[in-house]
């Protein structure tokens, strides 16, 4: 019941934000822009450009399909490096939130749920820490296989039927809600 209440609250917050007029939303992908968004002045520059273009809402991707997050977490691995680039140590999320709010923009956390591994680079919880939690898929002529054994599958998913997986994902969401002043959360996948 408690879990349902939290999810209902998050959905309500998101709906209220979008119902207040014509929104223009920009999704800021954390992997594609990892290096670009690795400096406070660069973040402020891009938020300024979004505001100048009439964007009213930002969705900041903070948990991508590797399952790594862009903040220090008690639950998930933190993405500090991507494509041989090491991000300098600074408060990435609050830099975005402050810049967006300074322009009166709404900012949501974008979070991939149950997507916790990227097969192309072999990164994510399904490859190491939570290998036993990976989803099992039916593959014609091969039967049931763990997602990490399926060729050509770029995104690896955790098994949402497992209670420990549900708790893990909810703990990450709660952690974000407790620690950051986002205006809402967009759940992806």
Segments (PLM) and residue ranges:
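Positively charged n-region of N-terminal signal peptides that target proteins for export
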Residues: 1-4
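Flexible loop residues that form catalytic
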Residues: 9, 31, 63
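Hydrophobic h-region of N-terminal signal peptides that target proteins for export
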Residues: 10-19
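Active-site-adjacent "subsite" loops/lids of carbohydrate-active enzymes
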Residues: 23-37, 114-179
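Catalytic domains of carbohydrate-active enzymes, especially glycoside hydrolases
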Residues: 42-68, 179-180
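Aromatic-lined carbohydrate-binding/catalytic grooves of carbohydrate-active enzymes
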Residues: 55-88
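Glycine-rich, aromatic-flanked loop segments that form ligand/cofactor-binding clefts
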Residues: 56-60, 92-148, 184-189
């Amino acid at each position: 019941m408690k879990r349902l209440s939290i999810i209902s609250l998050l959905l309500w917050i998101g709906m209220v934000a979008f119902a207040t007029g014509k929104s223009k939303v920009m999704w800021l992908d954390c992997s594609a822009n990892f290096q670009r968004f690795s400096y406070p002045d660069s973040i402020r520059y891009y938020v300024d450009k979004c505001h100048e273009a009439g964007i009213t809402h930002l969705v900041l991707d903070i948990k991508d399909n590797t399952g790594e997050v862009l903040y220090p977490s008690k639950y998930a691995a933190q993405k500090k490096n991507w494509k041989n680039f090491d991000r300098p140590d600074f408060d990435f999320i609050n830099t975005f939130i402050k810049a967006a709010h300074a322009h009166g923009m709404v900012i949501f956390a974008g979070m991939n749920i149950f997507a916790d591994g990227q097969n192309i680079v072999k990164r994510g919880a399904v490859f190491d820490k939570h290998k036993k939690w990976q989803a099992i898929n039916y593959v014609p002529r091969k039967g049931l296989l763990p997602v990490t054994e399926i060729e050509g599958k770029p995104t690896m998913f955790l098994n949402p039927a497992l209670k420990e997986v549900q708790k893990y994902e909810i703990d990450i969401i709660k952690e974000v809600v407790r620690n950051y002043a986002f205006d809402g959360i967009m759940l992806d996948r």
